[in-house]
């Protein structure tokens, strides 16, 4: 069998990992084995948190809508139920933005949900 020399392939593979690890502290950014572990962990965290971000934002929007709704004398669940009955098609992101940026308009939306 022919001898396989891994010069270029191995160096490229290592440099790819070290490039991804740039900016990591200490040996985590310069030593291949620890850098490889840190990069794998970072990629796992990134994958997990891309999904978690969607949940976190939804929770934030709901908290903001609930706070603004209670200032107008109605709970979050009653507001959302009323909006569904009134056929108001505003999603949670839009409602939260309204509550923060334009409380007057949000009050009008709450009034529509109450009636």
From Swiss-Prot:
Q: Which Gene3D superfamilies match?
A: 6.10.160.10, Ribosomal protein L20 (1.10.1900.20)
CDD domains recorded = Ribosomal_L20 (cd07026)
Q: Which gene encodes it?
A: rplT
Protein family per UniProt: Belongs to the bacterial ribosomal protein bL20 family.
Q: Name one GO molecular function term.
A: structural constituent of ribosome
Name of the molecule in the record: Large ribosomal subunit protein bL20
- Per the UniProt entry, what species is this protein from, by scientific name? Synechococcus sp. (strain CC9605)
* GO annotation terms (biological process): ribosomal large subunit assembly; translation
Q: Name one GO cellular component term.
A: ribonucleoprotein complex
Query: Superkingdom, according to UniProt?
Result: Bacteria
- For the keyword Chaperone, the answer is no
Pfam families associated with the record: Ribosomal_L20
Task performed by this protein? Binds directly to 23S ribosomal RNA and is necessary for the in vitro assembly process of the 50S ribosomal subunit. It is not involved in the protein synthesizing functions of that subunit.
Q: What keywords is this UniProt entry annotated with?
A: Ribonucleoprotein, Ribosomal protein, RNA-binding, rRNA-binding
């Amino acid at each position: 069998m022919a001898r396989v020399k891994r010069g270029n392939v191995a160096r490229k593979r290592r440099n790819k990992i070290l490039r991804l690890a740039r900016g990591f502290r200490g040996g985590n950014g310069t030593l291949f084995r620890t850098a490889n572990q840190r990069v794998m962990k970072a990629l796992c965290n990134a994958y997990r948190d891309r999904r978690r971000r969607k949940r976190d934002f939804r929770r934030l929007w709901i908290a903001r809508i609930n706070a603004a709704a209670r200032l107008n004398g109605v709970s979050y669940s009653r507001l959302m139920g009323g909006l569904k009955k009134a056929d108001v098609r505003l999603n949670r992101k839009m409602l939260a933005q309204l509550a923060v940026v334009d409380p007057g308009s949000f009050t009008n939306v709450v009034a529509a949900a109450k009636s």
